[in-house]
């Protein structure tokens, strides 16, 4: 007897969001599609197999698709779709392509006029900011910052002048280093560290960055993938010294702009005295 819940899918690329922790955090539509597609391209086939087993989906044809084989696997998947197959893409957790593999595949699919179907669902970034208590009307998702200290610091200096709420991903091994770098560059801003979201040991560490650092430093170890939400920079008035410095340093990178012009631009942006900012510009310029 035919399964009444089984659906017939058109050939195409289905971008399917999966749970970020709790295996029940998946949409009914996603389950129907995972059950019906010809192939599932999975970042971690073993993890996906557990998800399918939990929801009693049998007979799925899994294909590994991750950072290390993305280049070679992409044309193969496009070819399968061209020949009439339906292919679902899933990451280990959350929405595919959001700090996960898949960009090359989508780019090639667009170039080949392949049908692309989003199947939305869980996202750690959205889950974290929704419970952060920080402004949610406008935000910047940065994902994972560079692992090398120099490149990471450079990016943080660029972000120090960002007014919108910032969202970062980081591994438990490196999250304390990231927190310290952000505090050094951006000042002691409010933030929220979300850990093990939707799982048994779900935790949210809130407060100034210094307080979050202190809490984590007192622990013997940190477990679980982490999402860090940080307050954006001040818009007017009392600007953190680190934010002001980062803004000036960005201006100094433009060799064609005069020191006076840099001071005028920064002063206007933050509602500060031009003379005060000009003094800072001169001081930072002399340090370089």
Specify the residue positions occupied by each region the protein language model found.
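General beta-strand structural signal in soluble alpha/beta enzymes
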Residues: 42, 118-121, 168, 193
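A contiguous loop/helix-start segment that scaffolds small-molecule binding in enzyme catalytic cores
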Residues: 10, 86, 165, 172-287
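Short active-site oxyanion
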Residues: 34-40, 113-117, 165-166
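Class I SAM-dependent methyltransferase SAM-binding "motif I" and its flanking Rossmann-like core
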Residues: 104-162
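Glycine/small-residue-rich loop that forms an oxyanion/phosphate-binding "nest" at active or ligand-binding sites
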Residues: 74-123
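Generic beta-sheet signal
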Residues: 12-16, 85-91, 139, 164-168, ...
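Glycine-rich, flexible N-terminal cofactor/catalytic loop recognition
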Residues: 1-66
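Conserved helicase motor
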Residues: 65-71, 145-148
